[in-house]
Each structure stands twice: as C-alpha cells, then as structure tokens.
Amino acid sequence: MLLLALAFFFPAGDTQNVLPGKISFYGIQISTFFNHTVVENRGSGWLGDMEISSWDSEKETIIFRKPWSKGNFSNDEILEVEEIFQVYFFGFVREAQKHMSDFQVEYPFEIQVISGCEVNSHRSFDYFMRVAVKGLDLLSIKNHSCWPAPEGVSRAQEIWTLILQYKRICDTVEILLTKTCPRYLMSVIEAGKSDLQKQVKPDAWLSQGPSPGPGLLQLVCHVSGFYPKPVWVMWMRGDKELPETQKRDVLPNADETWYLRVTLDVAAEEAAGLSCRVKHSSLEGQDIILYWGHSISIGWIILAVLVPCLIVLVLFILWFYRRWSYEDIF
C-alpha cells in the first residue's frame, strides 16, 4: 500500500535553467500516526527546489502555489488525481494501522515518502521512491529496481512482500510514474519557464562571529537573496582556497531566494589579507570579492551619519542664541 505514495502529485534536483541537466518533480508525504485514531497527512509537490503544490488534508484537494502549477493538465484530470489521493490516504491509513504492529512499530510514529520522476538534458526519464519510518530509511526504488536500506533489511523485505500483494495498486503506480509523470513534468517546465530561468544576484557582507577560542577570530561571510540555489562561496588568501572554510546549509528566504552563511576560524594576526569570494550564475563571471578589514561596520556608518547632523544642530543653536541675544539688547 505504501507504493501508492509514488503517485503523489502526478508525481514527478536543482532547477537552474530549463533542461540544462537534470530536473525532477517529486512529492513529499509525511504521515504522522499519533495513536489508533488520530493521523495527520501532509504532502507537497516540488519542481527541483521550488514548492509548486501541496495537499489540503481538510478539503482533500490539491493547492497549486504557482499560476502554472497545473501544467497542461485539464480540470477533469486534476479531479481524477485528487480522487486517487482521497482513496489512497484512506487506504494508506487503514493498512498502516493494521500492519505496523506486525513490524513492532509503536505509537507515535511517522512515515515519510519521497517519490517522483526526473528528466535529463537528453529527455530520458527515471523514476524513484524512498520510504522511511521514524526517520530511518526503509527501502528505495529506482526505475524497476528495489533495494532495502542496510539498517532495515529484514523489515523492508517484509514490507516489500506485503506491498506486492496489491497488484492493482502497483500497476496504477507504474502507469502514473512512467506515463503521467513525464508528461506533467515536461508541461510544467514549459509553463513555468520564466520562473525557472530567472536569475537574482546575491548580496554579500562580512561580520565577526563569536570567538572560537583565545586569540582566534570567527570570520563570517553572508550571502543572501540569490536564485537559483547553486552557489559557490569560499574564504580565500589571495588565489588560494582555504579548506578550513565551514559551510552551513543553504536556507530559503521568504521571497523564494536563498541564504548561505560561511565561516572561517583563524588566528587574529592571520586575518589580514583574507577575502570571501562568491560565484553565482547571475553574476555572469563577475565574482563578488569582499576583503576582511576593508568593509565598514554598521557602527561607523551610523557615526558618519550622526556626526554631521550633530554639527548642524550645534551651529543652528549657536546661531539662534546669538540672534536672540542681539534682539534682546535692542
């Protein structure tokens, strides 16, 4: 029964340009079983790193988050797939509750499924699925091959045997992945071309983080507001990359751009001459290079603004006082 999760959002990666390499459409399902009666199903559909649809569990309908999220699918086709999901979630919950105790899974537990299809620059397709229970990988499927995760071989084999008992479901999943998904993926790529091809230049700035130890500095390079997601950021000494550079995860901003924080722990006397270099497709080869110690802190900027204002204010007070004193004499 778990395999029907493969059909999530017709099923379907980084999206850099339209078909420059690989682009995937995939659905993410998270089903949380709190007890025998309370279950929460969440789902979302993604084109590369962009969320384009989600599942409304109350209305049991698909929410399309982009004007082009339907691709070239008709309203009747949308209704048809929504009906498939409605039947699926009902059956999925029933079968999971029936069989999870057989596999010694205790409440509360969570089942996560990611599934979809991928197209490469040669327009050939692959489809895939991964299933996890309580955050532990259980099994993976790619094209017509299935293999259990090393940490759950025996349990995965038992579940796979159970799944194969539902032949009609497996046949439906295969059609959705091998026929419906490629058609949907290509149509949504074409419909969302302007969004997928957009380029947004990053902003970058330096700051000092908390000291990692006596005599040490933590240099922080912030890069924000860029799209698409792939970016290269590195601390440098001249033209030499510093392997001690520590990169965090690339995080999403609210406006669908991205943010990255890159740090370097260095002895205070060795900080001079270091720079942070940023490469991104939107920069068209004109890398951003920020030199440590050459940037002006916020405090100095504020001071530079306040000092002239204070001087003007003092001069005005002196002028007003002299004028008042002069008029008082006469």
Curated annotation (Swiss-Prot):
Which lineage is the organism of this entry classified under, starting from the top rank? Eukaryota, Metazoa, Chordata, Craniata, Vertebrata
GO MF annotation list: endogenous lipid antigen binding; exogenous lipid antigen binding; lipopeptide binding
**Gene that encodes the chain:** CD1B4
Output the Pfam families linked to this UniProt entry.
C1-set, MHC_I_3
Ig-like domain location, by residue? 182-292
What membrane topology does the UniProt entry give? Single-pass type I membrane protein
Whom does it interact with, and what assembly results?
A: Heterodimer with B2M (beta-2-microglobulin). Interacts with saposin C.
Q: List the disulfide bonds.
A: C117-C181, C221-C276
Q: Name one GO biological process term.
A: adaptive immune response
Side Extracellular, residues: 16-299
Signal peptide residues are 1-15
The protein's name is T-cell surface glycoprotein CD1b4
Query: Internalization signal: where is this motif?
Result: 326-329
Q: What are the TM regions of this chain, as residue ranges?
A: 300-320
Can you say where in the cell this protein is located? Cell membrane; Endosome membrane; Lysosome membrane
Q: Cite any additional comment in the entry.
A: During protein synthesis and maturation, CD1 family members bind endogenous lipids that are replaced by lipid or glycolipid antigens when the proteins are internalized and pass through endosomes or lysosomes, before trafficking back to the cell surface. Interaction with saposin C is required for the loading of bacterial lipid antigens onto CD1B in the lysosome.
Q: Give a yes or no for keyword Lipoprotein in this entry.
A: no
Which organism's genome codes for this protein?
Answer: Cavia porcellus
Q: Which of the residues are on side Cytoplasmic? A: 321-330
Keywords recorded for this protein, A-Z = Adaptive immunity, Cell membrane, Disulfide bond, Endosome, Glycoprotein, Immunity, Immunoglobulin domain, Lysosome, Membrane, Signal, Transmembrane, Transmembrane helix
What cellular component GO annotations does this protein have? endosome membrane; external side of plasma membrane; extracellular space; lysosomal membrane
Indicate which residues are glycosylated according to the record.
N35, N72, N143
